[in-house]
Amino acid sequence: MATTHGIALGMIETRGLVPAIEAADAMTKAAEVRLVGRSFVGGGYVTVMVRGETGAVNAAVRAGADACERVGDGLVAAHIIARVHSEVEIILPETPEDSDSAWCIANLNS
């Protein structure tokens, strides 16, 4: 039988980099979450991902979505997965061992 992990995943997809950075900033300020990655989907779409406890991820994604909407018409989607299945973990970015903000910034902008 497959297993699940207790750490939640929050995702915000935006139109453009500026709303993505605004959302990432708001998410990390709003709750105790880790910025674990971003993905340039194509066509100007960017997805930003955070991990943490379910309640914190929920608060962070709400704050990030609100911040993204204030920038303009940047919000495409916001979603939370409470307990990510172990089979899904292999396609997600690795979580940094410590909450090094330099790592987060470097991986957001690279």
Curated annotation (Swiss-Prot):
Coiled coil: none annotated. Keywords: Bacterial microcompartment, Carbon dioxide fixation, Carboxysome. GO terms for biological process: carbon fixation. Residues 8-93 form the BMC domain. GO terms for cellular component: carboxysome. Expression of 10 genes for alpha-carboxysome (Cb) proteins (cbbL-cbbS-csoS2-csoS3-csoS4A-csoS4B-csoS1C-csoS1A-csoS1B-csoS1D) in E.coli generates compartments that resemble Cb, contain RuBisCO and have its catalytic activity, showing it is possible to make artificial, functional Cb using these 10 genes. Cargo proteins can be targeted to these organelles. Artificial Cb assembly in E.coli requires csoS2-csoS4A-csoS4B-csoS1C-csoS1A-csoS1B-csoS1D (but not the gene for carbonic anhydrase, csoS3). SMART domains: BMC (SM00877). Disruption phenotype: Required for growth in ambient air. It is found in: Carboxysome. The keyword Transport does not apply. Pfam families: BMC. One of shell proteins of the carboxysome, a polyhedral inclusion where RuBisCO (ribulose bisphosphate carboxylase, ccbL-ccbS) is sequestered. Assembles into hexamers which make sheets that form the facets of the polyhedral carboxysome. The shell probably limits the diffusion of CO(2) into and out of the carboxysome. There are estimated to be 540 CsoS1B proteins per carboxysome. Unlike beta-carboxysomes, alpha-carboxysomes (Cb) can form without cargo protein. CsoS2 is essential for Cb formation and is also capable of targeting foreign proteins to the Cb. The Cb shell assembles with the aid of CsoS2; CsoS1A, CsoS1B and CsoS1C form the majority of the shell while CsoS4A and CsoS4B form vertices. CsoS1D forms pseudohexamers that probably control metabolite flux into and out of the shell. Homohexamer with a small central pore. Interacts with the N-terminus (residues 1-136) of RuBisCO (CbbL). PANTHER family: BACTERIAL MICROCOMPARTMENT SHELL PROTEIN PDUJ (PTHR33941:SF11), PROPANEDIOL UTILIZATION PROTEIN PDUA (PTHR33941). The tight homohexamer forms a small pore which is positively charged. Belongs to the bacterial microcompartments protein family. CsoS1 subfamily. This is Carboxysome shell protein CsoS1B. It comes from Halothiobacillus neapolitanus (strain ATCC 23641 / c2) (Thiobacillus neapolitanus). The gene is csoS1B.
